[in-house]
Every structure is written in C-alpha cells, then in structure tokens.
Amino acid sequence: MSIPETQKGVIFYESHGKLEYKDIPVPKPKANELLINVKYSGVCHTDLHAWHGDWPLPVKLPLVGGHEGAGVVVGMGENVKGWKIGDYAGIKWLNGSCMACEYCELGNESNCPHADLSGYTHDGSFQQYATADAVQAAHIPQGTDLAQVAPILCAGITVYKALKSANLMAGHWVAISGAAGGLGSLAVQYAKAMGYRVLGIDGGEGKEELFRSIGGEVFIDFTKEKDIVGAVLKATDGGAHGVINVSVSEAAIEASTRYVRANGTTVLVGMPAGAKCCSDVFNQVVKSISIVGSYVGNRADTREALDFFARGLVKSPIKVVGLSTLPEIYEKMEKGQIVGRYVVDTSK
C-alpha cells in the first residue's frame, strides 16, 4: 500500500495560536504502533482545552489535536500483533500506556503515570494519517460506518464508563447535566439501553428537541427554570439515584450534589478549567452521597461501548463537516452552540 510523505492536517504551534490547515509530514509508526488512515474524527470539548492550554497538564507543542479518530490500518511496527492491513481501527484519548504499573495491571490504564494522550501529548486524529499504540487502539468491526462510530471512541466510552460508576439499577433515575451535547446525547442513549429513566438538564435552541428524539423522559431547561434543584427533586420524587455531570459548569456540579438522592452517586466527567467541586458536608454525610470522578474507560469498557453501538442501541447525533472547518467548530464550542457532535471528514 502506497503511503504519501505528506498529508493534510490542522496544527497549532502555541496555546490558543492560529489553527493552521496545511500540509504536514505523515508520521512513521514505532515498533509497537499502528499507522491509521483516519477517515473521520469526532470533535470533543477536550480538544478545545488542548488548544487553549488551560488544563494543569502540559500540552505537546506544536500539536495536532483530536482523539476520536476512525479509520483503516495502513501500516504497523514490527512488534505489532493482532492487527492486519485493512482492519478498521479507532484512535482513543488514551493512545498508549505502560501496561506494567499497578494501575495498568488493575485495568485502570487511563491512570497510568506514563499514559500517552491522543491530541494532547501525542499528535492526534485531526490529520489524515495518525499513529496509535496497537494495544490501546480500538478494534472496529469491518463495515462499520466510520463517521458514526467516531464519537463512540471518546464520548461513548466515557459516558458508558461513567454510568457504570454510578452503580444504578434498572428503573433508577439518572440525571444527565449537559444532556444535549456530544457526551450527553450519547449518555442518554446508553442510560436508556441500560434500563434507566433519564432526566436531562441543558439549555439553548434545539436541545430539548434532540433530547426527546433520543428517548429522554424529562427535560429541564436551565435558561428557563430558576430552581433546578427543586425541579429535579419534584420530577424524580426525591432526587436522581445517579447524576452524570458532562457539562462544563462549576455551578451545575454543585447543584448536582443537592439534587442527587440519598445514597446516590454524582459522577464528575466534564472538567471546567479551574473549577472546584463544592458539596455541603452535612448534606453529603447525612444523605450518604458519593461523589466520584470517572475518566474515560479501559479496553473492556471500549469493547462494551462499541458493542452497544454495533447492536444499534446507540447512535451518534452527528454533523459531518470538512477538517478544514475546525476553527469554526471551536468558535461554536466557545459560544456553547453545539448540539450533538461534530465529526470532521479528513478528506475535505
């Protein structure tokens, strides 16, 4: 298979610097890596943080962002096993880990101190060819719609793992804060498929319509409802059994600690820059509330999340645009105007 020397990609050279759509070199895979011809990539709010450089974790510069890449294996290093040319493969946030530390041995690879992160410490999927550690790359079934599956590789895996972390049972109420965004819209569908009743919180044009179209039961528009806590308590007859916080709002996180049910769990997923998690200690102790963080997912979570997708239980509400339009997508993200998930076609 002929592999070009150069390719189109979006790169920036300094934090919040110009996003340049230009010709860049095609990377060479290391001994343990795949070279993937990326066809489509989802665009995640984390990509915006990587560009802004506003998280406490240092970003590689210059950087090609992106960590929801779906494509075809076109090359591999000499030590790679279990893959062949032509396989469908996914590039995840966790590009690689050491597989030898205590975290990796327990299946918590995302907590590996040597983790390599796509679109953050490792050039990601906003280019036509990208590399990924063969152990962590996602196996995608042949014939899968690569545009549709791209958001599952981060957003889907992340919310699926978060729902597992909430320790819910069928029939329980789960509140999803940020329910109509890229992560939230998938969380609604995974929650429904897992047998939960879904309450969504979001605000803005078209968001309630999207929420209801994917099976959500109760929607609360924070731009219209002044008492979010009271509204959730009333709708769920005492509070949500679990909360999945995917919004990037510190106030939303604090509110979730007040509308979660006694003995319930609020799961933190979204990471607003510089935000703190504030919970009234008396309320937390007396109600026996758990507050936990959930950070992407491991290889088993990946396999399970992709299985839900393959069986038609979840579908990404996507809008496909050209990779060259990435700066415009970031602008929409900064203004909170994203409904569903944008996916970029690397050929445009």
Curated annotation (Swiss-Prot):
<keyword id="KW-0560">Oxidoreductase</keyword>
<comment type="subunit">
    <text>Homotetramer.</text>
</comment>
<dbReference type="GO" id="GO:0005886">
    <property type="term" value="C:plasma membrane"/>
</dbReference>
<feature type="binding site">
    <location>
        <position position="98"/>
    </location>
    <ligand>
        <name>Zn(2+) 2</name>
    </ligand>
</feature>
<dbReference type="GO" id="GO:0047655">
    <property type="term" value="F:allyl-alcohol dehydrogenase activity"/>
</dbReference>
<feature type="binding site">
    <location>
        <position position="104"/>
    </location>
    <ligand>
        <name>Zn(2+) 2</name>
    </ligand>
</feature>
<dbReference type="InterPro" id="IPR011032">
    <property type="entry name" value="GroES-like_sf"/>
</dbReference>
<feature type="binding site">
    <location>
        <position position="49"/>
    </location>
    <ligand>
        <name>NAD(+)</name>
    </ligand>
</feature>
<feature type="cross-link" description="Glycyl lysine isopeptide (Lys-Gly) (interchain with G-Cter in ubiquitin)">
    <location>
        <position position="234"/>
    </location>
</feature>
<dbReference type="Pfam" id="PF00107">
    <property type="entry name" value="ADH_zinc_N"/>
</dbReference>
<feature type="binding site">
    <location>
        <position position="271"/>
    </location>
    <ligand>
        <name>NAD(+)</name>
    </ligand>
</feature>
<feature type="binding site">
    <location>
        <position position="154"/>
    </location>
    <ligand>
        <name>Zn(2+) 1</name>
    </ligand>
</feature>
<dbReference type="GO" id="GO:0042802">
    <property type="term" value="F:identical protein binding"/>
</dbReference>
<feature type="modified residue" description="Phosphoserine">
    <location>
        <position position="213"/>
    </location>
</feature>
<feature type="binding site">
    <location>
        <position position="182"/>
    </location>
    <ligand>
        <name>NAD(+)</name>
    </ligand>
</feature>
<dbReference type="InterPro" id="IPR002328">
    <property type="entry name" value="ADH_Zn_CS"/>
</dbReference>
<feature type="binding site">
    <location>
        <position position="207"/>
    </location>
    <ligand>
        <name>NAD(+)</name>
    </ligand>
</feature>
<dbReference type="GO" id="GO:0120542">
    <property type="term" value="F:ethanol dehydrogenase (NAD+) activity"/>
</dbReference>
<keyword id="KW-0832">Ubl conjugation</keyword>
<comment type="similarity">
    <text>Belongs to the zinc-containing alcohol dehydrogenase family.</text>
</comment>
<feature type="binding site">
    <location>
        <position position="67"/>
    </location>
    <ligand>
        <name>Zn(2+) 1</name>
    </ligand>
</feature>
<dbReference type="InterPro" id="IPR036291">
    <property type="entry name" value="NAD(P)-bd_dom_sf"/>
</dbReference>
<feature type="cross-link" description="Glycyl lysine isopeptide (Lys-Gly) (interchain with G-Cter in ubiquitin)">
    <location>
        <position position="319"/>
    </location>
</feature>
<feature type="binding site">
    <location>
        <position position="181"/>
    </location>
    <ligand>
        <name>NAD(+)</name>
    </ligand>
</feature>
<dbReference type="GO" id="GO:0019655">
    <property type="term" value="P:glycolytic fermentation to ethanol"/>
</dbReference>
<protein>
    <recommendedName>
        <fullName>Alcohol dehydrogenase 1</fullName>
        <ecNumber>1.1.1.1</ecNumber>
        <ecNumber>1.1.1.54</ecNumber>
        <ecNumber>1.1.1.78</ecNumber>
    </recommendedName>
</protein>
<feature type="modified residue" description="Phosphothreonine">
    <location>
        <position position="223"/>
    </location>
</feature>
<feature type="cross-link" description="Glycyl lysine isopeptide (Lys-Gly) (interchain with G-Cter in ubiquitin)">
    <location>
        <position position="226"/>
    </location>
</feature>
<keyword id="KW-0597">Phosphoprotein</keyword>
<keyword id="KW-0007">Acetylation</keyword>
<keyword id="KW-0520">NAD</keyword>
<feature type="binding site">
    <location>
        <position position="296"/>
    </location>
    <ligand>
        <name>NAD(+)</name>
    </ligand>
</feature>
<feature type="binding site">
    <location>
        <position position="44"/>
    </location>
    <ligand>
        <name>Zn(2+) 1</name>
    </ligand>
</feature>
<feature type="modified residue" description="N-acetylserine">
    <location>
        <position position="2"/>
    </location>
</feature>
<dbReference type="GO" id="GO:0004022">
    <property type="term" value="F:alcohol dehydrogenase (NAD+) activity"/>
</dbReference>
<feature type="binding site" description="in the open conformation">
    <location>
        <position position="68"/>
    </location>
    <ligand>
        <name>Zn(2+) 1</name>
    </ligand>
</feature>
<dbReference type="GO" id="GO:0000947">
    <property type="term" value="P:amino acid catabolic process to alcohol via Ehrlich pathway"/>
</dbReference>
<dbReference type="GO" id="GO:1904408">
    <property type="term" value="F:melatonin binding"/>
</dbReference>
<feature type="modified residue" description="Phosphoserine">
    <location>
        <position position="279"/>
    </location>
</feature>
<keyword id="KW-0479">Metal-binding</keyword>
<dbReference type="InterPro" id="IPR013149">
    <property type="entry name" value="ADH-like_C"/>
</dbReference>
<feature type="modified residue" description="Phosphoserine">
    <location>
        <position position="316"/>
    </location>
</feature>
